[in-house]
């Protein structure tokens, strides 16, 4: 039943305009449009292009796409259907999380495959570690997206809150320009956002980075679980 629920959510997301726009259309258009500009401005951008664009895909999909989808589940008729049929409310979060994980990973794989062919981007030095860091960042960011979707009921406020997290994640993490160009206090501020640690782990892996991402995931997931329990009462 659980696998059926995940598969059903995956198929529903394929038909969802929100998922299509936030997970595939906008990130991939940004990738194909901006990659050439990045490389023209800074030829060394080929070294980090795959990681930079993957971080953008992850943050766009998880922070902009997930909250409205969860809002539809827990703010509308779906929640009543869950209760009427005795389905645990947490199932909606888990299926949305797993479905979004797969869709976002597919978009990241498109970037991984297309960047070397289209823009001469360099592959990561250690591909397995790169994908471990990508998966960790994806889990953390999806957990934050779920937290936003559960904590804010109206779609307008969800979008506003998501943008408050999304824009600093993109601008301060180092994917648009070297983080060293930022003032010192903004470099410290950037560390608050998972995208910063994730991008560093994907480009210059250090042993401490994955535990930090794991801790951030546990905090976001724990907060989401508390909110879900409150909503269930």
Language model segments and positions:
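Hydrophobic alpha-helical transmembrane segments of multi-pass membrane transport/permease proteins
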Residues: 12-40, 46-65, 105-107, 162-171, ...
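Alpha-helical transmembrane segments and their short interhelical loops
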Residues: 89, 97-162, 167, 207-210, ...
